[in-house]
Amino acid sequence: MSIQASPVTILGAGSYGTALAIALSRNGYPTYLWGHNPTACAQMAQERQNARFLPDISFPEALRVESDLKSAVEKSKDLLIVVPSHVFGEVIQQIKPFLHNRHRIIWATKGLERGTGRLLQNLVEQELGSQYPLAVLSGPTFAKELAAGLPTAITLAAENEQFAKEFQARIHCSKHFRVYINNDMVGVQLGGAIKNVIAISAGMSDGMGFGANARTALITRGIAEISRLGVSLGANVNTFMGMSGLGDLVLTCTDNQSRNRRFGMMLGQGVDARTAMDEIGQVVEGYYNTKEAYMLAQKQGIEMPITEQIYQVLFCGKDAKEAATALLGRKSKVE
């Protein structure tokens, strides 16, 4: 079997996992989608769509739904994990007994480890050792647009160049899904995780009616925060100007398809965090990532004023307008 035709298993049947499964199977190559809920998997297999998250988008013929985790893992050497960051470690532990030397592990989860602020790469290496090639897939992608076949570009980061090229060839589709490769896994992971925090700030600003100027300032200073933290952890600063950095940040901060932006808008309008998350009805990664990003910045001794103020709002009871005042009242400095 050629590299391009080799199967891929996607672990996680939420909106983004399903969208990636649809995109990767459009080229006719075998793709498997596993979800933790057997009833939901049976419904998807029967209806040939994910009616809950992506209604009216039919599954390509090459996409098969798997409810048995062992079977799903054994069907492919390439495993693409697409689950919320707070259950990522649990999924790694669940697949561990089924792994063989041939397996390669990729994730599109955007976040940091709950409670520690560690990169997900560190979690994987601690749980599984260094025997499996690793990669991370990240960039400006909304699930609905990706599933609908609209043009999308994304970054695939791996330290093993051969693995990166092989998986790029497997998932790249010139018609709608363009994949760039990068060797900076640290930078790509951080860009995907912390952009959600900045998106909350941009949403808060818009919710308070501060306008486009303020939103743009938050995006610009936000990428500066992410870059400072990334460089302190060994990332390449140029990574943050790419798809997984600035690209993902701009998308998430400016379009209402972003849950994190919508969450921030509700905060800016005076809605409390729990009510806002309940109304959105899906995981708001930025809520969880804010605490971890703040912890990581403190550990590294990096100044991240936007992240700090969002942390104060979410976890210390600070009013959104007070947070905005604190940012605007900071001492003038050279850019």
Swiss-Prot record:
One of its GO terms (biological process) is glycerol-3-phosphate biosynthetic process. It comes from the Bacteria. It catalyses: sn-glycerol 3-phosphate + NAD(+) = dihydroxyacetone phosphate + NADH + H(+); sn-glycerol 3-phosphate + NADP(+) = dihydroxyacetone phosphate + NADPH + H(+). PANTHER family: GLYCEROL-3-PHOSPHATE DEHYDROGENASE, GLYCEROL-3-PHOSPHATE DEHYDROGENASE [NAD(+)] 2, CHLOROPLASTIC. This is Glycerol-3-phosphate dehydrogenase [NAD(P)+]. Pathway: Membrane lipid metabolism; glycerophospholipid metabolism. Catalyzes the reduction of the glycolytic intermediate dihydroxyacetone phosphate (DHAP) to sn-glycerol 3-phosphate (G3P), the key precursor for phospholipid synthesis. The gene is gpsA. GO terms for cellular component: cytosol. The active site is at 195 (proton acceptor). Belongs to the NAD-dependent glycerol-3-phosphate dehydrogenase family. NCBIfam families: PRK00094.1-1 (NF000939), PRK00094.1-2 (NF000940), PRK00094.1-4 (NF000942).
